[in-house]
C-alpha cells in the first residue's frame, strides 16, 4: 500500500470510488472533490493498493481559525472497508497536523460513525446541521 497526495490524474478513479459508495450524497461529494482538487489549500491523501485508489481523505485549513484543519471527506471503497485504510489516512493527517503545527483537526460525522472517530482519538464536541462535530487536538 502507498499513501500519497492526490494528483489531477486520480480524479476519475476517485469519482468511480464515490459511485461505488452508492450514498445519497454522491453529487455533493463529487462537487467537494472537484473543488478541493482545484485548491492549493487542500490537503489530499490517497491510499493506493496495486495501482488502484482504495481510499482518500481531503482536508483544508479552517479560514477563521488558521491553527485548525477540517476534514472535508474521508471515503473508503466498499470492498476495502474495515481493513484500516481510513485509520491509516487519519493517522497520516494527524502527522501532517503536527508537522504544520496545527492545534486541532475537526470533522463532522453521522451518529453511526461516532464510535469509529472516537477510536481515532476524536471527541464529540457538539451537534451541527451536518452531524456530530468532533475534534482531535494534539
Identify the function of each model-found stretch.
Residues 1-3:
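Extreme N-terminal starter segment of soluble prokaryotic enzymes
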Residues 134-138:
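Short beta-strand-to-coil "C-cap" segments at the C-terminal boundary of structured domains/repeats
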Amino acid at each position: 500500500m502507498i499513501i500519497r497526495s492526490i494528483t489531477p490524474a486520480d480524479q476519475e478513479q476517485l469519482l468511480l470510488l464515490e459511485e461505488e459508495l452508492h450514498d445519497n450524497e454522491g453529487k455533493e461529494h463529487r462537487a467537494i472533490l472537484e473543488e478541493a482538487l482545484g485548491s492549493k489549500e487542500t490537503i489530499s491523501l490517497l491510499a493506493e493498493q496495486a495501482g488502484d485508489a482504495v481510499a482518500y481523505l481531503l482536508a483544508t485549513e479552517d479560514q477563521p481559525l488558521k491553527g485548525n484543519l477540517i476534514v472535508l471527506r474521508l471515503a473508503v471503497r466498499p470492498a476495502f472497508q474495515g481493513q484500516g485504510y481510513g485509520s491509516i489516512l487519519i493517522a497520516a493527517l494527524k502527522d501532517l497536523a503536527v508537522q504544520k503545527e496545527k492545534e486541532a483537526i475537526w470533522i463532522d460525522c453521522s451518529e453511526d460513525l461516532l464510535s469509529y472517530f472516537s477510536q481515532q482519538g476524536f471527541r464529540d464536541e457538539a451537534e451541527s446541521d451536518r452531524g456530530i462535530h468532533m475534534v482531535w487536538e494534539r
